[in-house]
């Protein structure tokens, strides 16, 4: 296995990835043409990886068949240019295995496996779940540690244990435990990817390999420049980019659900023609869109605020 260096961390899935939204038609169907066009747009704007059917892809409200068709559409559009990961995590190990095998058959380059949610497994059960899924295909696995949604963290010793599996190679970290992250980075060869746009720069400075971002839908080139600056040891430039993007992070990640806001941002910037989401989520309100437009303008990412 290759080893990281002070200048170049391990990057099994690239550096700048979006947790890609799933476009829907006005009638609520998955819009495969829009999904393919969005994938091309992201690749042309700083991304070297995409995650399909993650939380921001509204995976809890898409069927297995829809997930498969969506993944294939993205792979057909950009699979020869960037890393494409399939979100396959559920709170049912057997179902996760089914999704993982379907993703492998479709041609995915890797799997994103979130901590099982709601049933709150203890750490030994988490390790069993992750290694069982990793055993089930030949694809590399990125774990997704997000206790704010799943209810359970992946503890440091559990990460160290599962890192011994040859196909568990990365972690999407949205836990907010800088101390624990430092220990895992020191004790394993797991590649860390920031899963929280508010702490992209701190995690990169700690040695993270890259980001799996929501805000990158409208700031991919900026985040690519941030990663490059950190690689070059130019934290002054990296910090300037981080500071410039703060209003966008606020607008997309704090005023409503990230997927709701980022779909509105993609509509504001002309990338998507609508901002439909699936219930129980609701689209951004006119007031939310106006506030978001102001935040994007402050970050230099959109025109002046729209009238509500």
Curated annotation (Swiss-Prot):
It holds the Pfam family DHDPS. The keyword Ion transport does not apply. One of its GO terms (molecular function) is 4-hydroxy-tetrahydrodipicolinate synthase activity. InterPro entries: Aldolase_TIM, DapA, DapA-like, Schiff_base-form_aldolases_AS, Schiff_base-form_aldolases_CS. The record marks 55, 118 as: Part of a proton relay during catalysis. The keyword rRNA processing does not apply. Pyruvate binds at residues 56, 212. The active site is at 144 (proton donor/acceptor), 172 (schiff-base intermediate with substrate). It catalyses: L-aspartate 4-semialdehyde + pyruvate = (2S,4S)-4-hydroxy-2,3,4,5-tetrahydrodipicolinate + H2O + H(+). It is found in: Cytoplasm. Its EC number is 4.3.3.7. GO terms for cellular component: cytosol. Pathway: Amino-acid biosynthesis; L-lysine biosynthesis via DAP pathway; (S)-tetrahydrodipicolinate from L-aspartate: step 3/4. GO terms for biological process: diaminopimelate biosynthetic process; lysine biosynthetic process via diaminopimelate. Keywords: Amino-acid biosynthesis, Cytoplasm, Diaminopimelate biosynthesis, Lyase, Lysine biosynthesis, Schiff base. Coiled coil: none annotated. Homotetramer; dimer of dimers. Belongs to the DapA family. HAMAP family: DapA. This is 4-hydroxy-tetrahydrodipicolinate synthase.
